[in-house]
Amino acid sequence: MGNIFSPTHLIVILLIIIVLFGRGKVSELMGDVAKGIKAFKKNMKDEEDILEDKLERAHHSETVDVEPQKFQSLSVKRATTRVKGSSSSRKGKTSVVKKQRVK
């Protein structure tokens, strides 16, 4: 008598619920609970998939970003050496700058 959740007490409580609400309502309620559990599991799986995709993209973007920076620094070095070699006087550069300001 001390244990409220004994099997006999649970059966009596279940019978009272069935009598009060009817079999149709109880089965409908249990169906709704099952749908809720399925939706919850589906959403949890979707969230895990989204997080895995974001992690994979972040890892992939980190490896891709490193290589263009190396190529960019090489092209900048080549461009600066070409500019230094092609310029013969400073007066030519200043006249170009003055023309751009006039426009």
From Swiss-Prot:
Membrane topology per the record? Single-pass membrane protein
Tell me the GO molecular function terms.
protein transmembrane transporter activity
Please give the InterPro entries that the UniProt record associates with this protein. TatA/B/E, TatA/E
Region named Disordered: 77-103
- Report the domain of life of the source organism: Bacteria
Keywords for this protein:
Cell inner membrane, Cell membrane, Membrane, Protein transport, Translocation, Transmembrane, Transmembrane helix, Transport
Where found, per UniProt?
Cell inner membrane
Look up keyword Methyltransferase and say if it applies: no
GO cellular component, as recorded: TAT protein transport complex
Positions the record marks as coiled coil are: none
The answer to keyword Transcription regulation applying to this record is no
Q: Where is the composition biased (Basic residues)?
A: 90-103
User: Which residue ranges run through the membrane?
Assistant: 1-21
An example GO biological process term is: protein transport by the Tat complex
Q: How does it assemble?
A: The Tat system comprises two distinct complexes: a TatABC complex, containing multiple copies of TatA, TatB and TatC subunits, and a separate TatA complex, containing only TatA subunits. Substrates initially bind to the TatABC complex, which probably triggers association of the separate TatA complex to form the active translocon.
What does this protein's UniProt record list under function? Part of the twin-arginine translocation (Tat) system that transports large folded proteins containing a characteristic twin-arginine motif in their signal peptide across membranes. TatA could form the protein-conducting channel of the Tat system.
Family, similarity comment: Belongs to the TatA/E family.
Annotated protein name in UniProt:
Sec-independent protein translocase protein TatA
